[in-house]
Amino acid sequence: MSLHSTFKKISPTTLLKQEDWEGLCLYFSQHPEKVRDSAGNEQNIILFAIACLRKDETDVGLTLLSDRVLTAKNGRDLLRRWVISPLASSQPDAVLQVVNKLLAVNVCQPEDVLLVASVLLKSKQYATVADLAEQAWLAFSGNSQIFALHLRTLVLMDKELQAISLARTQAQEVPPRGDMIATCLSFLNKSRLPEDHDLARALLPFFALERQESAGLAVDTLCAVGKYQEAIQTGESALARGLDGAALRRSLGLAYYQSGRSREAKLQAAEHWRHALQFNSDNVRIVTLYADALIRTGQNEKAIPLLQQSLATHPDLPYVRAMYARALRQVGQYTAASDEFVQLAREKGVTSKWNRYAAAALLQAGKTSEAESVFEHYIQARASHLPQSFEEGLLALDGQISAVNLPPERLDWAWEVAGRQSGIERDEWERRAKWGYLADNFLLDWLECRGEQADEPMYRLADISHVEQFFQRLQLDQRGCIIVSAHLGAMYAGPMILSLLEMNSKWVASTPGVLKGGYGERLISVSDKSEADVVRACMQTLHSGQSLVVAIDGALNLSAPTIDFFGQQITYSTFCSRLAWKMHLPTVFSVPIWKNRHIHFVLERMVDPLKFESQLSFTERWKENYLQCVTRILQSDPENLRLSGGIWRNIIRRDS
């Protein structure tokens, strides 16, 4: 029997079912009248187009798919069965063109779009998927899955605000569409606008918490409006009802973590993230949350293998590498830590803060020459961006205020503690506070990077004759004293003032011990020494008759102890008060402050131990004295808030 006679007897439908694409093409080549562009041939033309597309003859196949052919009976169904489904993974570009043609004539179905979009997303063709999703949303404006896809692709195209705006519009529909709520919540929670968070919360009564993902989303929504305890109750209630999974555990851990910075809250958060990892061990977000909580509760040994695993699969994530380096340093693996910090410094550039960490880590690893080289390059790079004079730079700070981006909870807390009673309008108060933040950081840059011009900031000093008189009245003789400070005011002016007064003192700071010049010679660096080494250096300083300067609200260790202060947990060390009690030394609270953009020096003699007073009693009384001093600085001019480091590190949004 000849091949020609065989094809006469086999129908195109049979060849289609046999997936005999060569046979189909041959059949229609022998019967050209069946695929002529005329009424009644639409079904055959569809089959011919399918055969061409399956043979990878894309241009021919697409040409055959005219609007009339596409809208013929069963046209879309045949294309879905024989082209879209089987070719989406292997020939996504061809399938995309078919889907776009179907969309253009309004016969496409949402599942066609979702299938090809999922494939294109895996290959990171975000712009292509975004265009497809936008067209699909016009065609299927009521479809919840297309809505979610459209918003997701907008975010991938850096159009998050547009995505949030669409979510906002949809969320305002009355009554709310139940199948749209999850997507609306996800995007409204990302918004920076409090009214969007309130809108999201208003949707919760209509949101069915039937799955652990939905419960997790409800927890996130409550956290976004500061209802942490309600969020915790919602999450724990879902667990009690048998809902459990990575999403819920992740969100519940965040609720505990955001509810307070106490060790107990961090431990509870860590426990939920540990469970989340059991459901999804490859989720980098959960791994890093868990590792961060472990580090902040002093469990560095447990965090290290988790972070190692994450870096092995995601070596391009700097925040993971930073946590890994910190954990290594805390357990004494200084060489390994220095390697990680050096890599961070290289990746982030010569002016990044990681060069400071790298220099300190190299010193701890015994690599002094490398540390000096890294820090010197860091100094030179920063110096190249500084103005010609200190005055020029200080005057330019007003123009930089609008670019300052600080955690809003710090400003909110400071406003409640100090700003509201100041009589200054909130906007002006914030502007002045941000100027103080810029000014102290500029002062640090200048003193570190322009050693030959280190005298220039001194022209901004007010009369400091009272400082010398104050210390003379202490009648120290051959003894030193303990000068305590906080991350407030013009903090970095402190060493400069004491140097100007030729006071025999050393200062404890996180600056690496490779800093050159007079300030460097008086430095006890906490960043390149163990805690035991720092304690020994401080004791030796005081025993030698020198004074010691310490900002006791600072700590490199993320698990450093905290105390309650105006409803927040702030870092606080009892080291100085215990030393004062043990060595019978006077203590002084001291902070350089800004007043009319000049630097003044606040000094206050702190309480001494009473006769036969126990250490516990004294340290408690001394702590209250210290916090009173800190409060007075906070409630002075807003320029003196400083807003970073020390007491500011753990400030969180309070449960509303």
Swiss-Prot record:
GO biological process, one term: polysaccharide transport
InterPro entries: TPR-like_helical_dom_sf
Protein name: Vi polysaccharide export protein VexE
Purpose of the protein: May be involved in translocation of the Vi antigen.
Coiled-coil portions: none
Keywords annotated in UniProt: Polysaccharide transport, Sugar transport, Transport
Taxonomic superkingdom: Bacteria
